[in-house]
Amino acid sequence: MDFLTDKFSLKNQPSKAGDFFMGGAGTLEHVMDSMDTESFYSKSPAVVAAAAGASKCVQQGFSAIHRAEHHVRMERASPCQENNANYGLAKVEGQTVHTELGRSMDTCCSLAVSPGKSMADKVELDELGDKCDSNVSSSKKRRHRTTFTSLQLEELEKVFQKTHYPDVYVREQLALRTELTEARVQVWFQNRRAKWRKRERYGQIQQAKSHFAATYDISVLPRADSYPQIQNNLWAGNPSGGSVVTSCMLPREPSSCMTPYSHSSRTDSPYTGFTNHQNQFSHMPLNIFFTESLLSGSANGHSFEAKPEFERRSSSIAVLRMKAKEHTANISWAM
């Protein structure tokens, strides 16, 4: 503008173009209209041509300044920034700016959302999605349970007695007769086969148990004649001693070993009860009966050779019995 005022004489001295624009009272169109009027410059052709070129340059400069300031105002009035009071005023102009940049206002706002808020929204969306998935899965798991009638079960059992694995054709025919679907018939046969296998397995277990009990049945109290008749070499080698032992140990008849000494002055002694057979059996051990069977077996000739261990045991037991009987006899004689 200083260049214009120096070269050309103006009729009036108006304010400068910068003051005109920056003051806020005028606009770019007002300035350009005032510069295009004939009364603004002198009427000479050279002045008019120079004024036209200068006005074009000024118009280009003002348009560049206007675009820059427009961008600044739109950035300040962006809807992406929170608590902006100028958003409503610059919304229309902002649409053109963001359209020129290749994105819309919604895209800008979606990019400028705070991270905390976006994470909270994401968690809520995930929870809603999980609830929807759980509802869908629960609805899928819920199955319809078929209740069979007696007629349907009768028809199914008839076919099962013939075959446990019916083919597709048989299942379809059975489904038509029972008014069921082929899938329901197939599932029934699967369950029926599983039940049949379970019963068969249980029956086999019970049969094995009964067979084991019948095979290994042992009586608790066997008879006395079931024992084998074993010969005692000690008594067979000494027949005279065997007769003495037999007469002393066997409770068949009261012998001299067991009979107490009958003294005239001691007849009323309480130890005279040894003559009673009941007292004899009560005071004698049960192994005497086993010794009797051994001795009787040797007499009948149905014996066999015993092992050395058994011989030693039987001999030691016999010696102990002899000592016990001698001690009892001595006590009875002393009485």
From Swiss-Prot:
InterPro entries: HD (IPR001356), Homeobox_CS (IPR017970), Homeodomain-like_sf (IPR009057), OAR_dom (IPR003654), Paired_Homeobox_TFs (IPR050649). Keywords: Activator, Developmental protein, DNA-binding, Homeobox, Nucleus, Repressor, Transcription, Transcription regulation. A motif (OAR) lies at residues 315-328. GO terms for molecular function: DNA-binding transcription activator activity, RNA polymerase II-specific; RNA polymerase II transcription regulatory region sequence-specific DNA binding. The keyword Transcription applies. GO terms for cellular component: nucleus. PROSITE patterns: HOMEOBOX_1, HOMEOBOX_2, OAR. CDD domains: homeodomain (cd00086). It is found in: Nucleus. Residues 141-200 bind DNA. Its main location: nucleus. The keyword Ribosomal protein does not apply. It comes from the Eukaryota. Belongs to the paired homeobox family. PANTHER family: ALX HOMEOBOX PROTEIN 1, HOMEOBOX PROTEIN ARISTALESS. Sequence-specific DNA-binding transcription factor that binds palindromic sequences within promoters and may activate or repress the transcription of a subset of genes. Most probably regulates the expression of genes involved in the development of mesenchyme-derived craniofacial structures. Binds DNA as a homodimer; required for transcriptional activation. This is ALX homeobox protein 1. It comes from Xenopus laevis.
